[in-house]
Amino acid sequence: AYYTENSDTFVSQGLDREGEKKIDVRHILIQPENGVKDDDGNTTYSEEDWEAARVKAQQILDDWLAGEATEDTFAEAAAANSVDSSASNGGLYSNVSQGDMTDEFDAWCFDDSRQTGDYGLVRTRYGYHVMFFSGLSWYNTAKSALLSQKSNNFVDNAIGQFEMTYDLNKLAIAGVQLGNATE
């Protein structure tokens, strides 16, 4: 209902649930080590290098599954383990269209049976990817916007119901006294 009521806003952001399917996915990239570069700058890896990368990726997946196994803990694992630039964002690729990624990555993401919360390993020319399917972009964005709106409404209502007073001279941020605000 929220998406429908605000569809113009979402469509203007490229998040049309009736249009092209766009997804959000998290991943942890584990690259093989000890590659050899040829004259063209292409790196090749031995089967032992690929197997070592697969074992490391599988161990990361197993460790994640042995814990809470939530999207948040996956994001933490991505930040700690991925060599991809998305690691700083918890391994998140958002608003991905089919064809944006390698064929193998795309095939996993856009499999018709893919459901929010699915996970797995995918091998591409870049290495092994520990995958987590976050869901359809339009849905995730609408859900986030709705939660933000409800949170803002809650705070606004709370502020309206209770009188608040404050002394700027005693204002502190994160435990640091700011002193006299008029100085």
Spans of features found by a protein language model:
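PPIase-associated folding chaperone regions across multiple families
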Residues: A1-A52, A79, Q98-E183
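Peptidyl-prolyl cis-trans isomerase
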Residues: V55, Q59-E104, S134-G135
